[in-house]
Amino acid sequence: MTKLEVCCYSVDCAITAAQSGADRIELCAGQREGGLTPSYGALRGAREKIAIPVHPIVRPRGGDFCYNATEFAAIKYDIEQVREMGFPGVVVGALNEEGHIDLPKMREIMAVAQGMAVTFHRAFDMCLNPYIALEQLTDLGVSRILSSGQQQTAENGLRLLRELTQASRGPIIMAGSGVRLTNVHKFQQAGIRELHSSAGQWTSSPMRYRKIGVSMCSDTELDEFSQYCVDGDVVEAMKRAVSPDREMQYVS
């Protein structure tokens, strides 16, 4: 059975995804930066209101995945908090200066995250050698790897995703980036059994007064009066598309 993980940038979105049939939530902040560690308030809200598994991302900043000592300390503190709050899993990753898995840091992360399922996030798509990385993450005991097959979209990276799925002796390969209703069957046909999607759309802010010429972001072209929200209808449609009955249609 194909599982659908929905990437959510708020508790409200996570509630919508859960009610619409998602199998798991990746809880994030910072949509425009590709996902950052959610606040304590968001974490607490998710624990109180969502029954399906929620795996928060722990990522202290946008940009690359090579962390200094201060940033790495923050990562470990955040993982401790996530574990103590009772979350079943966490999404995290670290690379070294040469683009390989940062093994010393990842060993510490695995120790701190003991008892939780660890997903190595799309830092995997920025690493030098995905096959070596897969072996290293297998030895570390990582539960799954979120990847676009080292391409901008998972559909473009499907060949590598298929190869990694066939080669993996442990971690589940979960396809993410550009996974949508129109292409889920391609991943199923490739033997990929976990999919990651934001399953939503940009929605306009309810604010009627909108100050012109002032931005809270250095990129003044960004629309700050919109936010990305999960669409429950899209989640439901994707779940129907990956149902066992549909899977049999793709196989036959």
From Swiss-Prot:
It is found in: Cytoplasm. The keyword Magnesium does not apply. One of its GO terms (cellular component) is cytoplasm. GO terms for molecular function: copper ion binding. Disulfide bonds: none annotated. Keywords: Cytoplasm. The keyword Transmembrane helix does not apply. It comes from the Bacteria. Its main location: cytoplasm. HAMAP family: CutC. Belongs to the CutC family. This is PF03932 family protein CutC. It comes from Pectobacterium atrosepticum (strain SCRI 1043 / ATCC BAA-672). The lineage of its organism: Bacteria, Pseudomonadati, Pseudomonadota, Gammaproteobacteria, Enterobacterales.
